[in-house]
Amino acid sequence: MNETYIKDYINLFSHLSLNNIEQFDNFIDKNIIFSDPFNDIKGSENFKKIFYHMFKNVKDPSFIVLNYSKSENKVFLKWKMAFYAFRSKQFIEGLSEITLNSDGKINCHIDYWDSMNGLFIKLPFIGILYALSLKIFKAKI
């Protein structure tokens, strides 16, 4: 596994914009599988559409890769996404599990993050319901 390749992929995420989404083609297999709490897709064009959609619908999104580790054909990234919503800057932290194929291209990218605590509880109606459910179900220790 090429260390420079991984660092270049991380650098792309850290500087991601509408102007450089097409650079993913340098890193991903044309049949990449991508999954996160909202999407399950296959193919490099669909992978890039996820990010075009993000920049269209999310105000000022950015990623910071906090650290990474690698093992054989896998890379794990710990990251923080920042964006503006609900009149303030919001943050979501998550992990990405990235698998490389025998050609060294990324053929699987799975994002793990908590959509309930990271996003949904900040929505007015859902946040109120969530707070009420915590009063019922959360243990008082």
Question: Which positions does each model-derived feature cover?
Answer:
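A generic structural signal for ordered secondary structure
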Residues: D8-L12, I32, I92-S96
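Short acidic-aromatic low-complexity motifs
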Residues: E3-F27
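Basic/polar N-terminal segments that are highly enriched at the extreme N-terminus
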Residues: M1-T4, I141
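Short histidine/acidic/glycine/proline-rich micro-motifs that form metal-
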Residues: N11, F38-D40, F83-Y84
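A beta-strand edge to alpha-helix "cap/lid" segment located at domain peripheries
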Residues: K56, S62, K70-I141
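A solvent-exposed, acidic/Ser-Thr-rich amphipathic alpha-helical stretch
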Residues: N26-K74
